[in-house]
A protein has these predicted regions:
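Extended acidic/polar, glycine-enriched regions
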Residues: 1-14
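Intrinsic disorder/low-complexity signal
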Residues: 2-3, 102, 142, 236
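Substrate-binding/active-site clefts of carbohydrate-active enzymes
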Residues: 16, 22-28, 34-103, 110-229
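Conserved beta-strand positions in the central sheet of alpha/beta enzyme cores
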Residues: 106, 152, 235-237
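Receiver (REC) domain switch/active-site residues of two-component response regulators
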Residues: 232
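Aromatic- and carboxylate-enriched substrate-binding clefts and catalytic-loop regions
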Residues: 239-241
Length: 241
């Protein structure tokens, strides 16, 4: 080691280290919420019509139980059992979440979907009507930010739901604009490549520029439009794929 090296003093970390320390994602305490199960909605009776059969709206005091596989729906019955929580009822509990010391409120999927878990998206741009509306999301974001927290949504962009208009149109004909969004092959269960071979969750062909444009690349993409509504970031489902 030279005299110059000895007298140079301690090494200065690159600016990127300082930026990382200032990043709100670094070391944040994250509170995860399944909106349907978190806080009982006071308007439950008024929105019962949003759970048409074979969906079931359960009593808030009931304990979830494993159901049976529904061949006609290609899901388990417990996947379409609902407890009726929504975005307004979640907003009413923000003080509780704040007092726990949470830095980030992370919501499991809130977009339009067939099941209670929401990982089978029907439309990424719409909020499930039993949860509320995009205006409700904007109000939630404002209230979250007023408490010094961040709001993160679940980005389920590896696959969509089999009941989605995009998949149904793609499956109906090879000339559909959505045909290239999915990988069709009779060698797959259900005729299309699906996450974990779950036929209700056909995988998107992320390499397709049209899919990229719809999800994140386009000016009106899913990712950009929700960020404009006030959310702070995304948790990416199945990111390793």
């Amino acid at each position: 080691m030279s005299d110059e090296q000895l007298s140079a003093g301690p090494a200065q970390p690159p600016d990127r280290f300082a930026l990382r320390e200032a990043d709100w994602r670094n070391g944040a305490l994250v509170y995860q919420v399944i909106v349907d199960r978190f806080a009982q909605s006071p308007r439950l009776a008024a929105k019962g019509y949003l759970y048409p059969a074979p969906k079931r709206l359960r009593d808030w005091s009931e304990t979830p139980e494993k159901g049976r596989y529904l061949d006609d729906q290609e899901v388990w019955s417990h996947e379409i059992d609902f407890w009726g929580g929504d975005l307004p009822s979640l907003r009413s509990r923000l003080e509780y979440i704040d007092e726990l010391g949470a830095d980030v409120l992370y919501l499991c999927p809130i977009h339009l979907a067939w099941t209670n878990h929401g990982y089978d998206a029907l439309d990424y741009q719409q909020v499930r009507p039993d949860y509320g509306s995009r205006d409700d999301v904007r109000r939630l974001a404002e209230d979250v930010h007023a408490r010094g927290m961040k709001l993160v949504l679940d980005g389920v962009f590896n696959h969509m739901g089999r009941h989605s208009p995009a998949f149904q149109a793609a499956a109906a004909g090879q000339r559909s604009r959505y045909r290239g969004w999915f990988d069709f092959d009779q060698g797959y269960p259900g005729g299309a490549r699906a996450w974990a071979n779950a036929v209700n969750l056909p995988e998107l062909v992320i390499e397709n520029p049209a899919v990229q444009d719809h999800i994140w690349a386009g000016d009106d993409s899913v990712v950009r439009s929700w960020l404009r509504d006030g959310i702070d970031g995304w948790r990416l489902d199945v990111a390793f794929e």
